[in-house]
């Protein structure tokens, strides 16, 4: 399989050219209703097409949440396929937010579903869960290297329940979250200008100075907007790693739909706020 240019290099270029903003595509039923759309495959398709039209190619990343498509069965997955393909054709990098995690051949099959160049759902990167052991991700790591794609590994997530696992302390004195960050630093060692194996770290977590976030890879940071974090918080939370942060905004942008211009304006406002905060750090 002939791979793309590595995901980390493509992402760094997109961040430099368009700013680091990631816009989530989260068509949950209440948001479809706010847009005046039916909670149906038709509503799902209209919603997704509108978001892609509004912001693809204007922000660094689009991140569809696969569960909101999967709930409609095969017809919803068909809409997801179309959404991914149209977003990439319009110039966006697509991170599939599927949070897959398993072992052996099953993990390999999950990786092939999203990271193999011939897959209908082929995306630029995939979110994965390492909590069957980081080594369980090795099939996905190998395929990502081969295909020029990337992974975002759940490390320090923004949901309160995550701390039960991620802040647990191992026998060697390190937390589970810190261990995951250490694995990513090894994956990305020596990569320029940016490694392809990133961490998911919540922007709402406050002071993370006890963690080494410099993994030489991207940090996908949910929590900006509706969850309470702001662009101005990013330097304090992420410190010297802030230049590698890809802040995710979903509802803060999507609530401005269904008007394409309003969606685009909201995304551009967030992008400018983030760019200003990162530049000033």
Feature map (PLM): residue ranges:
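Conserved, mostly hydrophobic/aromatic
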Residues: 23, 62, 97, 126, ...
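C-terminal helical cap(s) of enzyme catalytic domains, especially alpha/beta-barrels
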Residues: 234-244, 253-281
């Amino acid at each position: 399989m002939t791979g793309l240019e590595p995901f980390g290099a493509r992402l760094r270029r997109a961040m430099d050219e368009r700013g680091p903003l990631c816009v989530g595509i989260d068509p949950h039923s209440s948001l479809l209703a706010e847009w005046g759309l039916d909670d149906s495959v038709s509503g799902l398709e209209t919603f997704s097409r509108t978001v892609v039209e509004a912001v693809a190619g204007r922000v660094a990343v689009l991140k569809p949440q696969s569960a909101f498509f999967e709930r409609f069965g095969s017809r919803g997955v068909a809409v997801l396929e179309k959404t991914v393909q149209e977003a990439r054709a319009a110039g966006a990098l697509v991170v599939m937010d599927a949070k897959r995690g398993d072992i052996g051949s099953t993990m390999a099959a999950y990786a092939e579903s999203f990271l193999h160049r011939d897959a209908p759902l082929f995306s630029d990167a995939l979110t994965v869960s390492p909590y069957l052991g980081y080594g369980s991700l090795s099939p996905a790591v190998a395929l990502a290297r081969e295909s020029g794609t990337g992974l975002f590994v759940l490390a320090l997530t923004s949901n309160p329940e995550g701390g039960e696992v991620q802040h647990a302390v191992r026998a060697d004195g390190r937390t589970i979250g810190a261990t995951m960050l250490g694995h990513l630093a090894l994956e990305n060692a020596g990569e320029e200008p940016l490694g392809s194996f990133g961490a998911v770290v919540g922007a709402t977590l406050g002071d993370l100075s006890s963690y080494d976030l410099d993994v030489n890879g991207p940090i996908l940071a949910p929590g900006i907007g509706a969850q309470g974090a702001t662009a101005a918080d990013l330097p304090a939370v992420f410190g010297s790693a802030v230049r590698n942060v890809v802040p995710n905004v979903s509802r803060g942008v999507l609530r401005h739909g269904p008007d394409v211009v309003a969606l685009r304006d909201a995304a551009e406002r967030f992008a400018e706020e983030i760019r200003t905060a990162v530049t000033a750090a």
